[in-house]
């Protein structure tokens, strides 16, 4: 019994690693809630329609993912080099934090989108290194549990600054400031929270798995990318998993990133949207912990398909969404499964790759994840513009989940 308890007791380094999830998740929550509202206000001031607003927001998200897709493998291979991972991780965090603050200085929609792209690329770049740190922070037998706790505490911890920011925005008039000023303060508060929660990891992390420093490191990184891609032909499990992950997680991130923009385009009440997404974070906390515990009883090959099937149902439900109460139902169900699918995918991948090449492989992982979500956002944006219906755009995401489910079953049999 004591051994079982000891197994789930986090080390100081594991706690520091999890704390970064608490910090960056605050930025993720802001991107999913208040930042689209900020952009919507600027877009309306610039004469954009609701459909154009949703489309341009989707195009900006697509631009981020294309840039991330190009940079991730390069950053990932550099990260595997001795003493490279922490400095480049620190730089990416700095880019994200500075960009988060700078968004509040934009007065028109186009500069705002450009700064948003800058900040989101920094955030996405930091995750290449953060995810690859998992193999240095803990051992394979603890990866599912630690990864799940990272997402779980990230969800609930991100609510702390968000509640403060939400109170500022909703109560701006009562404290004598404009809503735009309140949004500026929200961006600053989130940036400070992100920075402060990063410091323990920067102090404690030491790279355990690495390759030695070589001359012409950048040139060598491209050579190693080529070698890894060739090796994927031999490692069929990793190859098929990445193809499956490319599809299903693309749909997951699109739903998360565009939820507020989608609800706003449908004309739903802004306050209701924000509170519903806060509920998503609260529901996601225990749900992620539950999936972490279930991973000790059932293999990820069983749990991940359950999550994919649930998201297919979410996309289908979104196609018929018209009323505020339906958005609340959607928010709760998304919260139930988003932690499980993200955490189990990350830990499952960490267990099937060489630990000394974790940065290199997680560079590919991020291409197929956050770096590949341009497909989902493009489906939503193009579908919305062609049909004039946001429901059609979001509902079309079900294709990604069906294909992802089939490919994952193939990978699990390899």
Where are these predicted regions, by residue range?
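Helix-loop boundary and gating motifs at the non-cytosolic
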Residues: 7-65, 237-269, 273-276
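Glycine-rich segments within core transmembrane alpha-helices of 12-TM secondary carriers
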Residues: 147-169, 366-376
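A membrane-interface helix-boundary motif in multi-pass transporters
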Residues: 50-52, 169-192, 382-401
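Multi-pass alpha-helical transporter architecture, strongest
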Residues: 193-204, 395-414
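Structural signature of the two symmetry-related core transmembrane helices
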Residues: 87-102, 302-317
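Helix-loop junctions at membrane interfaces in 12-TM secondary transporters
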Residues: 103-116, 319-331
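Helix-to-loop junctions at the C-terminal end of transmembrane segments
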Residues: 70-84, 286-300, 384
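Juxtamembrane intracellular "pre-TM" segments in multi-pass secondary transporters
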Residues: 2-14, 206-243
């Amino acid at each position: 019994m004591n051994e079982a308890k000891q197994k789930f007791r986090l080390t100081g380094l594991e706690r520091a690693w999890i704390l970064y999830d608490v910090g960056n998740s605050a930025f993720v929550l802001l991107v999913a809630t208040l930042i689209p509202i900020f952009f919507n206000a600027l877009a309306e001031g610039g004469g954009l329609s609701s459909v154009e607003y949703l489309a341009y927001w989707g195009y900006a998200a697509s631009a981020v993912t294309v840039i991330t897709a190009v940079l991730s493998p390069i950053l990932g291979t550099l990260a595997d080099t001795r003493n490279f991972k922490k400095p480049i991780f620190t730089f990416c965090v700095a880019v994200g934090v500075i960009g988060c603050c700078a968004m509040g200085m934009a007065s028109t929609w186009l500069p705002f989108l450009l700064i948003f792209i800058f900040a989101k690329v920094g955030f996405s770049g930091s995750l290449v290194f953060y995810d690859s740190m998992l193999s240095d922070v803990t051992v394979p037998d603890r990866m599912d549990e630690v990864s799940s706790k990272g997402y779980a505490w990230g969800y609930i911890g991100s609510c702390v600054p968000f509640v403060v920011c939400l109170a500022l925005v909703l109560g701006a008039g009562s404290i004598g400031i404009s809503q735009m000023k309140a949004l500026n303060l929200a961006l600053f508060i989130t940036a400070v929270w992100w920075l402060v929660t990063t410091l323990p990891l920067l102090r404690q992390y030491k790279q355990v798995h690495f390759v030695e420093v070589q001359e012409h490191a950048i040139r060598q990184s491209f050579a190693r990318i080529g070698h890894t891609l060739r090796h994927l032909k031999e490692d069929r499990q990793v190859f098929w998993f990445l193809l499956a992950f490319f599809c299903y997680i693309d749909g997951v991130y699109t739903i998360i990133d565009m939820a507020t923009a989608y609800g706003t385009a449908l004309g739903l009440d802004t306050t209701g949207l924000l509170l519903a997404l806060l509920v998503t974070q609260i529901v996601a906390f225990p749900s992620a912990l539950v999936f972490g515990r279930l991973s000790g009883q059932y293999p990820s090959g069983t749990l991940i398909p359950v999550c994919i099937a649930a998201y297919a149902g979410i996309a289908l439900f979104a196609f018929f969404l018209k009323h505020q109460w339906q958005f609340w139902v959607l928010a709760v169900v998304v919260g139930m499964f988003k932690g499980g699918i993200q955490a189990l995918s990350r830990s499952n991948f960490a267990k099937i790759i060489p630990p000394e090449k974790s940065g290199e492989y997680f560079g590919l992982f991020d291409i197929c994840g956050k770096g590949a979500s341009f497909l989902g956002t493009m489906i939503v944006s193009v579908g919305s513009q062609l049909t004039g219906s946001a429901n059609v755009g979001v509902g079309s995401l079900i294709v990604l989940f069906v294909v992802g489910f089939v490919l994952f079953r193939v990978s699990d049999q390899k």
